[in-house]
Amino acid sequence: MTILREIGIIARALDSMANIEFRHVDLAKGQYLYLVRIVENPGIIQEELSDLLKVDRSTVARSVKKLESKGLIERRSAAGNLKNKELFATDTGKKLYPFILAEHTYSEQQALTGFSKEDAQLLEDMLAKVRQNITDDWELVKKGQKRNYGDV
């Protein structure tokens, strides 16, 4: 089966193009993903961002630090919980959001060229199911447990 290889190729190609196209706004190496989620989820904390994007906390911490140093996001102490820092896009970060969404919309339209609306919806539903299946294993491994490959 080569389904995950195909998904990986598509994801890497889209990410590579986005990274090139976002260079002129000083976004590098997937930082646009973090900025979009922070704009869409004002007050999100890093752990929630990690879960949302399915990346480890240290990767989130590095990207958040870079976005903050560029003035695109800011951290604020959460009300009643000084340990958690809520993340918010600055006005500068919010101004990039429509541009990033335009790239996303264009890429999705290109990727789905030749698909009927029904086929596109079916693909979205199937990929959501794949994501949920992977999420279960991701949660398991994230907690230090091992997956069982015994019946593969």
Regions flagged by a language model, labelled:
Residues 1-25, 141, 152:
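N-terminal leader segment of winged-helix/HTH proteins
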Residues 50:
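The alpha-helix within a helix-turn-helix
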Residues 13, 17, 33-36, 95, ...:
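Pre-recognition alpha-helix immediately N-terminal to the DNA-recognition helix
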Residues 8, 36-40, 101:
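Short, locally clustered residues in the helix-turn-helix/winged-helix DNA-binding domain
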Residues 65-128:
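Charged, amphipathic alpha-helical coiled-coil/dimerization segments
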Residues 41-45:
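Short capping segments at the starts of secondary-structure elements
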Residues 117-152:
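C-terminal regulatory/oligomerization modules of transcriptional regulators
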Residues 46-47, 58, 65, 85:
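Residues within helix-turn-helix
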